[in-house]
Amino acid sequence: MKHALRALRWATIILWILLVFLVITLVYSAFNVGIDVGEPQLFIGDNRIIWAIPARINNSGLYGIYDLNITTVVEDADGEILLKSSSFVSLVPKQETHQIWHNISISLEKIPNYQAYLTNDTNFIINHSIRLNFGKAVPCSFIFNSTIPWGAPLYNLHIGDPSCQFNATHCIVFLNVSFENHSPYINLNGTLKVEVLNQNEEKIGMNSFPINVPPYQGNGNYPAYNETLSIPVDVSKLTYSGKIRLTFQTSMFSYETEVPYELKEIF
């Protein structure tokens, strides 16, 4: 009986020694893991913006890092989730360094209520979370956030009151359109289609115009568009009131808006 108790006592002591050793080495390993996040690189695709963020994981600890997950959630100023992106690494062995690219891809037309961000500047909140597991024994997580400004590509969009010039069969509607491109990412290269509809919703005139406004370069001078557009209209279908529909079409987005018109006299 005494031998059994002595063996149990030694087994308990050894178990506690191993447990303390494990805790010490795990803490040591945790403090010897370095995660360096580099400067994001920007890529513009046909219909999306991609931020590629380089991350370097230096595991100088005594255990492998398992199930490394980097997740980024982008929210608007009201806390609504706009998009989510994750990167996963199954193993970073001990005493090794691993390089990954964490990509955040934005397709404007897939963002909820994206058209509001085409004409209004705002701030986006970027929430990052990093989760990992030391030696398949101790899970850890790190959470941090940042804020980035969003510049609207059609900021301060202004559509002036239309005016008309008449002849025997047609009239020409003149319409001034202006805006500023506050986006450092989006090159506004596309078309602006203008349609004139009478009060019966009949299309009585249409014209298309090229637009080419470069992205904002950060020098305080916003690239601007300010043009007076001309649209031929069929006089026989012209009514005293109606509306003018404008459609911006680019590789990054499409945006449609309407303004009413009202004439004091037709002839």
Question: Can you describe what each PLM-predicted range is?
Answer:
Residues S107-L154, Y222-Y225, I231-F267:
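Terminal connector regions
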Residues L62-D67, I81-L82, H182-N189, I204:
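Short acidic/proline- and small/hydrophobic-mixed sequence motifs that coincide with surface turns
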Residues G79-Q115, E202-V235:
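Intrinsically disordered, low-complexity Pro/Gly/Ser/Thr-rich segments with frequent PxxP/GP/PP motifs
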Residues Y155-E202:
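Surface-exposed interaction/gating patches
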Residues N47-G64, T169-P184:
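Short beta-strand elements of extracellular/lumenal beta-sandwich folds
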Residues L22-I49, I143-H170:
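Low-complexity, acidic Ser/Thr/Pro/Gly-rich terminal tails and inter-domain linkers that flank the onset
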Residues M1-I35, V177:
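Secretory targeting signatures
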